[in-house]
Amino acid sequence: MMSRKRQASSNDFFDMEQLLIANDALVHQNHSTPNHASDELSVNDPSPLSRGLQSDVNSNISRNISNTFFKKSIFFFVYYCKQALEFISTVFSIIKFLLNRRKVSFLLSFLLLFSLFLLIPNDGRVNIKFFYKDFVDRIPFRFIPSNFNISFGKHLEQAKSLFKSKFGNSSSTYNERDSIMPLLKLQSNLTEAKTLLYQNPISPEDVLLHFWDRNLMSTYDLKIQDINDSVNPLLNTYLDFIEKDIYLVSHLPVSEKHPGNIPISLVNKSVQAICSFAEHYNLLRNPSYRGFLRINNGESIFNLLCIEDLHESVNLDILCLKDILRNIAQSSKEAMYIVKRHNSSQSFYGNRSTTNFSIINSGLYLKKDAAKNLLAKQFDATYSYYHKDLEESVHQKLNSNLEKRVEKYIKHSCSQRNVADHPDFALKVVGAVVDYGWTFPKPKFSDILRDYWGKKANLPTALLDTSINSNWCNYEDTVQVSVRLNRPMYVRHISLIFPIHGDDSYFPREIQMFGLINDINYQILSNMNNLVLLATIPVSLSSVFEVNYYYLPKFSDTPGLLEEAYFNTFVFRAFSKNESLTSQICLYHIGIHGKEINEEF
């Protein structure tokens, strides 16, 4: 029955083909056979009759062609639909047979069809997805925004907030009062001096004698180290701040003697001097002193510290240097004795609010020769300084110093601190995958099967795990692995995990870090290769390395561009220590730390 149907359909197809051949021959004959009668009629007698005959012939030809094409298209549509139905019927019969008679055969056939897909690991499926994504990204005339933000800049206020968030909450170190008692006592003395000056203005010399002759600091055993000529400028600076501020406060009018109208408070200037002196001895690394200065003197003084060295702690005490202060006080006493001797007509301890200023001025300007080697030159030099744009000059100097230190902190100090504060994006749990297109040597098929069934395998995906047991070893002198992150980011640091025990000959000599770019996407880097060298990392026991963006030969003309560039794929190339046929390289987790492109620094 089926054979007769097929024969009938083939006969119909043969008849249709014969009809088409006959129709084509008729059309060809009408076009090619010369019709002399019509030619003569059309040439010699161009009458409406000849034009009518020609139009009838053309209409018949077009009608025959359209009918033939319509019949032919209907025939092929019905024919292919019939073939599709027969194929579906045959497949259904085979499946029905397998289900009824051979269930095991059906299961094996199903597994055979889908085994290749099941054997592909997760990274392989992700690579397939990214392959099509990259193919679409490379389509011309596709708008892709550039990854460079030229307008990005580091502002001082953002740096201050960053500094405050990093070091502003370490309150656990402020209870170590034993190590900061000298500084507390000095603070108490200066505060008492300031209060006394507010209430009863007296001479600077009397203030020094009153506090330092009482020997309030003698009960503390202070640690003094390496007092030599190099320290003397710092000591003089410290003493100058104290005397200048006392002199300034004592000569303000009584109505202005409150903290709001004092250009620079006695405490703040003294603490600035303490900071400059302590910086020479690395005292600012002690968290106790940092906490004390931040609590008692405000954020502005605390920000003056050497913040790039805050990662260490040194147990040293502040040097109060009472003997040198006593000598200065004695010199001040001698100077005042000279002043009083030349002004014996006035009572020094009388109405101090009215007589003290004239006595000091007479001592400065009338008896400058007598007090030349003591305090006269110092008072005369600082008088105009404090009365001419004092606030503006000090604030400019303060902001300039703070901006430089915070800028230095942002660039260099993070590498000396724990990278745990920065998230690690090169982890499998956060979406990082290995791009096998830029990875060599390629993994073996047996390792892929072992990894799929949960067995120990030598795959580069081990680098996406922080476990010390996860490593990727190869008998090569050079290996390369590419890590694709789940989002673009600004890279700031990388961390290398290597065991500190065992044979270190398996460790690489150095690791080169590249950023993978697309020439179509990034117009600024269009004249370079796809791989941009970010850093060359020497492998050592140090687990932290800061990527130096400013030491790149390719960006020597515009070094600031690369710092603003973000990357989504990073390539690591490791070189063996032993360049031989038996050399082996073992890589462990390589952490990529930084900021996402939508985060603010």
Curated annotation (Swiss-Prot):
The chain crosses the membrane at residues 74-94, 104-124, 531-551. Keywords: Endoplasmic reticulum, Membrane, Transmembrane, Transmembrane helix. It comes from the Eukaryota. It is found in: Endoplasmic reticulum membrane. One of its GO terms (biological process) is mitotic spindle organization. GO terms for cellular component: mitotic spindle pole body; perinuclear endoplasmic reticulum membrane. It is a multi-pass membrane protein. Its main location: endoplasmic reticulum. This is Uncharacterized protein C4D7.07c.
